[in-house]
C-alpha cells in the first residue's frame, strides 16, 4: 500500500537500546570529565595510555594552578592585616572550602536543570534571585553554628568571630550566585556548561573569599 511504501521509504535505520545506552554513557563520561577539570576520553580507563591520561589532566591542572596564583597575590597584599591579627589565618581554609562547596552545589544543580530542559538561559534573573535567597538561609545557618563554635570552643574574641561569620555569609552568597551564573553564561556563549564546574568555580571563589575576608577584617578590626 501507499502507506507501507512511505514507511519503508522513510525508514533509514534502527537505533538499538544498546546503541542508545552507549551514547548516554559516553555523554555522561564526557560531562564527568569536564566537571572535574579533565579532558574527555572515549576510551575505558585501563585502555588509555599513561600519555593519554597525562594529556587529559595536565593542561587543566596547569590552568588552575596559574589561576590560583591570584589567591596568593591577595594574601601577599594583605600581609599587614594577617600580621596584626594572626588568628585570621587559621580560618582561611574553612572559608574557602565553604565557598567552594556552596558554589559547586549551585553549579551542579543548574547544570542538571539545563541538561533535562528544566532551566533555560532566559531564566537567569529567576535563577539568581532564587540562589540569593537560598544562600542567605544557608549562609546564616553556617554563620550561627560557626559563631557558637568560635566563641565557646575556640575562645575567639567576639570581634574576630564576627569577621569570620560575616565573611562566611558573604562568601556563601557570592559563591552560589557565581555558581548559578557561570553555567548560564557558558550556555549563551555556546560552551559546554559542564566546563564551569567544581574546579573552576572553586578557583574563582577562593580569590573572592579572601578579598571579602580581609576587607571586612580591616573595617571591623581597624587594622
Feature-to-residue mapping (PLM):
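Non-transmembrane, extramembrane segments of multi-pass ion/lipid transporters
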Residues: 19-53, 104-128, 184-190
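Alpha-helical transmembrane segments in multi-pass membrane proteins
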Residues: 63-68, 91, 95, 99, ...
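Transmembrane helix-loop junctions at the membrane interface of multipass transporters and ion channels
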Residues: 77-81, 150-157, 182-189, 214-223
Amino acid at each position: 500500500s501507499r502507506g507501507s511504501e512511505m514507511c519503508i521509504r522513510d525508514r533509514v535505520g534502527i537505533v538499538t537500546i544498546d546503541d542508545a545506552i552507549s551514547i548516554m554513557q559516553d555523554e555522561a563520561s564526557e560531562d564527568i570529565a569536564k566537571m572535574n577539570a579533565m579532558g574527555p576520553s572515549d576510551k575505558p580507563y585501563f585502555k588509555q595510555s599513561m600519555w593519554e591520561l597525562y594529556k587529559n589532566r595536565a593542561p587543566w591542572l596547569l590552568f588552575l594552578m596559574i589561576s590560583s596564583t591570584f589567591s596568593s597575590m591577595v594574601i601577599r597584599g594583605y600581609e599587614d592585616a594577617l600580621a596584626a591579627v594572626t588568628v585570621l589565618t587559621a580560618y582561611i581554609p574553612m572559608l574557602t572550602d565553604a565557598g567552594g562547596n556552596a558554589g559547586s552545589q549551585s553549579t551542579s544543580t543548574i547544570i542538571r536543570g539545563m541538561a533535562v530542559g528544566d532551566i533555560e538561559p532566559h531564566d537567569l534573573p529567576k535563577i539568581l534571585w532564587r540562589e540569593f535567597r537560598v544562600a542567605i538561609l544557608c549562609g546564616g545557618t553556617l554563620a550561627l553554628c560557626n559563631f557558637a563554635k568560635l566563641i565557646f570552643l575556640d575562645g575567639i574574641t567576639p570581634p574576630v568571630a564576627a569577621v569570620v561569620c560575616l565573611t562566611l555569609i558573604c562568601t556563601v552568597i557570592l559563591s552560589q550566585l557565581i555558581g548559578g551564573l557561570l553555567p548560564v553564561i557558558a550556555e549563551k556563549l555556546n560552551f559546554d556548561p559542564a566546563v564551569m564546574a567544581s574546579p573552576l568555580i572553586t578557583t574563582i571563589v577562593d580569590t573572592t573569599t579572601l578579598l571579602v575576608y580581609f576587607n571586612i577584617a580591616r573595617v571591623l578590626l581597624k587594622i
